[in-house]
């Protein structure tokens, strides 16, 4: 019987490549992002490419095309000075990595799954979030995904 999962205990991390085009595999290489409150879907539907020929009489035919994550994805965080400092450190580390041809890897750890989700991305500097009366201050920080998200073995301790 399947064990169904919840979002309780999900963590999100980042690490800059030590070796170009090689995902970091040691847990110590990753830094946790604090205050993550929402992670966008990374399960896009592929485009449909129509392959209907003239001899079809009732239905069109298709093959799957490319998937599109939509470019920049918004991750929701509870705003704090710790988050602001951590996000600035992330953006700075990413800029330094890109200057040397390296990438920043993001890792989402869901308790109960044997693999983690990994992708490379470019974070956007944080702006001022929307604010309202008597509410939690949240910010949606953007990361532009730069490769195909993959499920892979979680980093070793």
What are these regions (language model features)?
Residues 1-4, 144, 148-157:
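Viral virion structural and adsorption modules
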Residues 31-34, 92-99, 125-128, 140-144:
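Short, low-complexity, polar/charged sequence segments that are solvent-exposed and flexible
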Residues 2-79, 120-136:
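Solvent-exposed edge beta-strands and adjacent loop segments
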Residues 107-151:
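Short beta-strand and beta-hairpin "edge-sheet" elements
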Residues 16, 23-24, 86-90, 143:
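Extended hydrophobic/Leu-rich segments
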Residues 54-120, 150-157:
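Extracellular/virion structural assembly segments
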